[in-house]
Amino acid sequence: MGLTQDFFPPTSELLEGGNQTSTFEFLLWGLSDQPQQQHIFFLLFLWMYVVTVAGNLLIVLAIGTDTHLHTPMYFFLASLSCADIFSTSTTVPKALVNIQTQSRSISYAGCLAQLYFFLTFGDMDIFLPATMAYDRYVAICHLLHYMMIMSLHRCAFLVTACWTLTSLLAMTRTFLIFRLSLCSKILPGFFCDLGPLMKVSCSDAQVNELVLLFLGGAVILIPFMLILVSYIRIVSAILRAPSAQGRRKAFSTCDSHLVVVALFFGTVIRAYLCPSSSSSNSVKEDTAAAVMYTVVTPLLNPFIYSMRNKDMKAAVVRLLKGRVSFSQGQ
């Protein structure tokens, strides 16, 4: 059954932009329209959420308690793990509550709040890999000046700038969504995101929609291009390295980051920059893509970054054994 009419039924109450009341509620489509699958999804997503939070928290604690990892690369990794925890916690707990209570509702104010925080933390998951790529570029292409360029002050500035910029961008896009008129209470997704809200908009505010599309494209493509340029230069520098051992060591510091970037940006570009229809199959594909970048990628990040990194694995083992290193050692 297509969703064009059944899934987006027009509501008798046109929701004019900026005039929505605090009593209005959206109905989320959820993870599946099959009731018999809800219990399976609840257990699966609960497991993934617990592992995601525990894994990323372990990364943060391991880096924070081991002075051997107090370097720019691990500072950015700890920041990314924090963003992953916050981003996942913005969407998954509400989805789990809705499954458990068999309720699909979310208040209008709650929807806007979820949208704002998801955009803020989600954009951090886009901006931080760009700073990490820049860090790897400096480490490999300008090794002699690395500590001078990537000073503690500059690292703190880059992360602070990312948080500030993502907050402002999220606030702008949330405000533009607030101004749109909505003609359906049913959102095609399991959380409040730009795509589902744009699909139920019936306003002709083309300027708002164009600004939203422009900002969304800029947030995704500019960091992606910076990452691409950084790694083109990194690969070029590595290939010019005189020794095979040096090339392998340089590649080993970048390959895990490339896996995360490819997985995350592939699904984000599919979700935000490739238009989709309101058909049943399209909604399911959009939901699957959303699961990938909101749940699966944050789940995999700790494993991808730690499995290929001996220092990270050693720090995690020391943390689990209670042997932390707060002082400069060895």
UniProtKB/Swiss-Prot annotation:
InterPro entries found in the cross-reference section: GPCR_Rhodpsn, GPCR_Rhodpsn_7TM, Olfact_rcpt
Glycan-linked positions: N19
Pfam family membership, one: 7tm_4
Keywords: Cell membrane, Disulfide bond, G-protein coupled receptor, Glycoprotein, Membrane, Olfaction, Receptor, Sensory transduction, Transducer, Transmembrane, Transmembrane helix
Cellular location(s): Cell membrane
The organism's place on the tree of life at top rank: Eukaryota
Example GO molecular function: olfactory receptor activity
Transmembrane segments: 40-60, 72-92, 112-132, 138-158, 210-230, 258-278, 287-307
Membrane topology value: Multi-pass membrane protein
GO cellular component entries: plasma membrane
Intrachain S-S bonds: C111-C192
Ranges facing Extracellular side: 1-39, 93-111, 159-209, 279-286
Principal location listed in the UniProt entry: membrane
Membrane side Cytoplasmic: residue ranges: 61-71, 133-137, 231-257, 308-330
Function: Odorant receptor.
The protein's name: Olfactory receptor 1P1
Organism: Homo sapiens
